[in-house]
């Protein structure tokens, strides 16, 4: 799956920028990395930095960048008077294994909070739920070891994979949230999945209206997390 990238707001930085920064740093050294990242930084105390670690649902597949979930969530939270900057660390097609592998680079601009929104592609590929659970377990443990506050966004298994698979997969998120004492948003696509008017023609990726529904339902969890932490 390919990600379209059209308009970018002045204060919203997609994950691709961090990847490019890392490649430049390998060539020119750590000073190159600092030079690329600092112009996008917000002075300490001005904004709470949140990373949204996910797949195409986060990246904004098929959407202009300003209509991606992180961008719209940032706008919504700012309209509520919350000083936040949300970094889009979504990579189309990514699995929990991919998210774990790139975790260090996703955190290159150090956040205080991370929304973990991975697992949709694990389900689509019928990956063993035990592996998905282990990857997410390691991601959350790593984030907590860095003192980062976590919101885990749950996913559900595709219905065509059978009851046994769905039962095992769907239990991953509440179990991990309880194990690590982190906040849980039960289902990232709540109110959007299988609703034609809220999805693109592929029936899998939310359109701009679908993203609005996600923001409306997800944002209270984020606001609660920010107020209490």
PLM feature spans:
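Bacterial N-terminal signal peptides that target proteins for export
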Residues: 3-30
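Bacterial N-terminal signal peptides
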Residues: 28-40
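N-terminal helical cap/lid subdomain that shapes the substrate entry/recognition surface
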Residues: 93-97
């Amino acid at each position: 799956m390919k990600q379209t990238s059209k308009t970018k707001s002045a204060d919203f930085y997609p994950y691709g920028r961090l990847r490019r920064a890392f490649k430049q740093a390998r060539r020119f050294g750590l000073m190159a990395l600092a030079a690329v990242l600092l112009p996008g930084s917000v002075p300490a105390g001005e904004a709470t930095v949140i990373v949204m670690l996910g797949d195409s649902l986060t990246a904004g597949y098929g959407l202009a960048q300003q209509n991606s979930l992180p961008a719209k969530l940032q706008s919504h939270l700012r309209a509520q008077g919350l000083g936040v900057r949300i970094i889009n660390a979504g990579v189309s097609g990514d699995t929990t294994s991919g998210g774990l592998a790139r975790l260090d680079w996703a955190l290159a601009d150090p956040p205080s909070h991370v929304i973990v929104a991975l697992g949709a592609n694990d389900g689509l590929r019928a990956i063993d739920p035990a592996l998905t659970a282990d990857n997410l377990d390691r991601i959350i443990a790593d984030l907590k070891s860095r003192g980062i506050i976590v919101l885990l966004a749950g996913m559900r298994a595709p219905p065509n994979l059978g009851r046994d698979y769905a039962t095992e997969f769907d239990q991953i998120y509440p179990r991990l949230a309880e194990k690590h004492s982190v906040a849980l948003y039960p289902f990232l696509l709540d109110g959007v999945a299988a609703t034609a008017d809220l999805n693109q023609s592929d029936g899998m990726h939310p359109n701009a209206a679908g993203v609005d529904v996600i923001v409306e339902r997800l944002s209270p969890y984020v606001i609660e997390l920010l107020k209490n932490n």
